[in-house]
């Protein structure tokens, strides 16, 4: 009987040592490059205060993001300025769902590389008609950077081609948006962005 009690701690020690060895062998630490890659792929919510922007809308009025941050939920849509406001399906879909957003006090800003007069031309009755939210031009002839400052700041420039990218972002009432690495992360589509801010 005494011999059996003596064996129990020995057996427990062997089991613990075996499990510990197995865990160490199967969970080998990654190299530094792999750890950096994992860190850059993490999705976290961060403030977009540093990503504030301003630009002229289709009526040449100055529109700025900052007054909405911390007060309202905001959807920012980067649409295809080359195709035009009357041809961009995501922009037209956002206009269709605008009443839902307005009922919940969600602000909407659409941004493109089109000039104010090009956006204004797309809003005529024989084309897309009016939009109930501002279409901001990402162009500043007085800036040394010139065009696409907003696109660059929000990570909406294709690194390989240098062309502007489309994308939609949902900012919560705290002024936060999802980030991957150092750039805000776009959502899959307008419907997903709308659902995320109205629920």
What annotation goes with each model-predicted range?
Residues 1-54:
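N-terminal targeting signals for export/organelle localization
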Residues 59-61, 174:
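Residue-level recognition of short loop/turn positions
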Residues 87-151:
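Structural microenvironment flanking redox-active thiols in thiol-disulfide oxidoreductases
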Residues 64-94, 107:
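Short active-site neighborhood of thiol/selenol oxidoreductases, capturing the structured segment around
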Residues 66, 154, 179-181:
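Short hydrophobic alpha-helix segments
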Residues 54-55, 170:
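Hydrophobic beta-strand positions
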């Amino acid at each position: 009987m005494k011999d059996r009690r003596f064996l129990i701690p020995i057996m427990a020690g062997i089991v613990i040592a075996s499990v510990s060895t197995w865990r160490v062998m199967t969970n080998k630490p990654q190299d530094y490059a792999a750890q950096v890659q994992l860190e850059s792929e993490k999705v976290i919510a961060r403030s977009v205060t540093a990503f504030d922007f301003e630009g002229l809308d289709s009526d040449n009025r100055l529109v700025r993001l900052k007054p909405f941050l911390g007060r309202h939920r905001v959807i920012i849509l980067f649409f295809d300025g080359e195709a035009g406001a009357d041809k961009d399906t995501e922009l037209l879909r956002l206009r269709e769902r605008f009443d839902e957003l307005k009922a919940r006090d969600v602000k909407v800003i659409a941004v493109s590389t089109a000039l104010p007069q090009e956006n204004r031309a797309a809003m005529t009755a024989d084309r897309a008609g009016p939009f109930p939210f501002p279409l901001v031009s990402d162009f500043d002839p007085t800036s040394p950077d010139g065009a696409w400052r907003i696109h660059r700041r929000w990570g909406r420039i294709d690194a390989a081609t240098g062309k502007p990218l489309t994308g939609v972002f949902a900012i919560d009432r705290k002024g936060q948006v999802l980030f991957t690495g150092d750039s805000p992360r776009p959502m899959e589509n307008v419907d997903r962005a709308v659902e995320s801010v109205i629920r």
